[in-house]
Amino acid sequence: MDEAAMSDRAEWEAETIWEIGASGEEVEALARDLGVSPLLGELLAERGYRDPAEASRFLQPRLSELEDPFQLTGLRQASERLREAIARRQWTLVYGDYDVDGVSSTALLVRALRLLGVPVTAFIPERASEGYGLTRKGLERAFRLVHRERERLGPGGKGTPDLVVAVDCGTTSVEELAWLEEEGVEALVVDHHQPAGRWPRACAIVNPHQDGRGSHLASVGLVFKLLHGLLKLEPGYRERLVLREELDLVALGTIGDVVPLTGDNRILVARGLEQLGRRRLPGLRALASVSNVGEKPTVDDVAFRLAPRLNASGRLDDAMESLHLLLTDSTSEAEEGALSLHRKNLQRRLVERQMLEEALGVLEKEPSALTSGAIVVGKRGWHAGVAGVVASRLLKRFHRLVAVVAFDESGEGKGSARGIPGMSIVEGLRVAAAHLEKFGGHDLAAGFSVREENLPAFRASLAGWVKREGSPELFRKRLKITRELPLSAAGLPLYDELERLAPFGAGNARPLFAFPTLSLERPPVQARGCTRMLLRSGDARCEAFAFDLAVSRVIPGRFQIAGHLDWDALGKRIRVRIVDWRAEPGGCLRSATIE
């Protein structure tokens, strides 16, 4: 995108409000009790940790602090059924989803069952031909795969599995699970998505939405809990299955699914990143190499390097390629597979860029969509596998509910939708369900199918719901800034202190600061979507950078920025990543959010 277009389109973006926090005596007391700085105490309180004991546990995430897995409804029954499958060596089909949570969930359960001696078939449907979740078409192909694998062990083998475990899917598959029951195949569902209506029937369902507990575990976290429950039932399995060694897969799916890194998720990711750094699995070792991930992986490494490559095969082709990478024990296969995923991710970027440009072009012709609170765009020839990425881009730019639909030549559309805090996209789809073929997901992300002729009615229904239930405040971007800091404070001591709050991510954002009274020491330079500059404030100097920023939008004269500290591993120095900036108070320029 050229700078002129980027600058023009910036005028559509939502205004950003800076909300700067304030500390008090309670925060100072917390800092004293913990023996930390007032700033760290302030950041802990900002995250809701005002009790010294709770704050201490937050700073030191331990596996021993994980909640009892049997608190999850259905988990004991699911663990018992899995124990039966292990004892009887029943052929098990693990049926997953094609995103990184689904792939890592499938890999985790398949690896565990194989270690425990269970004959198992792993299957992930093709997005384009079979669609999301348990479908008759996908199940029938999976059963053929089971039959072939059983035939290898001897002729006359049973043509169906003894047990199906649906991971990261199944909650909305009421008819498909009923069909399995008719076929005499038992099923377990381990999923974190919301039901579209009534719950399906299965031997056991592990889904936090059943009892309203509000667990934010991704499906891979639920699979971990299932295996934890299994080990509690049968401690003898621990000799073959060392669950902590599988935490790299748990971190992968948890971060990739952008669930809040609080509670159990924080513990699982903190310990999982450590395990990921050990490069245990050949596939993850090879993928880290082609992705330029260092010896100490971070949440950003997973979110922006590993996860996109693992997602690429499912978006453009067949996610079984990513699953094979996570399951292989061969170094040569791993290196070949990682390189293939890297190439597909480059292809995915090109497709995404073209679709985003076309979507923005549609909005230029229909600017009223930006005032309705719901952006709904669709086109024939768009790639369904990239619709979710484009929806996320539009959400970040405009802070509106977004639905992006890819239609095929027959008018069948597959869409991805994104919500905002306070406006559940699943609820919006439920209200507009009369115009959809099917839908499912959770509050902030969902998928759906719609006929091309029904798109206008769907758009009107969703926009009407937003108008009735929404408020203008929901559609204003807000930056929660901890405090104002001088540029001279942006150094290694502060960075090291802030890292005590890591891992950062959804629900535990990297601390954001306002740096006032700045000017440019040298003109900005742009390359590959990244704008770099040197900031000055008095005698202090600091490198800074921002993504997706046109050089023509750089503010001349005095300005202030909202940003967070970043470690430049190559240059071995601290720099500031710019999130937003604006003229000094009294200036005429509006804020211009970058991220």
Where are these regions (language model features)?
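Structural signal for conserved beta-strand scaffold positions within catalytic alpha/beta enzyme cores
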Residues: 19-20, 189, 205-207, 251, ...
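N-terminal amphipathic/basic leader segments beginning at the initiator methionine
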Residues: 2-22
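Mid-to-C-terminal polyanion-binding domains and interfaces
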Residues: 80, 84-90, 263, 333-377, ...
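Short alpha-helical basic/polar micro-motif
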Residues: 221, 388, 392, 561
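A short acidic, amphipathic alpha-helical/loop segment
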Residues: 175-180, 375, 390, 493, ...
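Acidic, metal-coordinating catalytic cores used for nucleic-acid/nucleotide bond scission
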Residues: 99, 129-131, 166-172, 213, ...
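Hydrophobic helix-and-loop "lid/oligomerization" segment in the mid-to-C-terminal part
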Residues: 20-163, 183-184, 232-453, 457, ...
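Active-site cavity-forming subdomains of large catalytic enzyme subunits
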Residues: 140-143, 147-216, 220-236
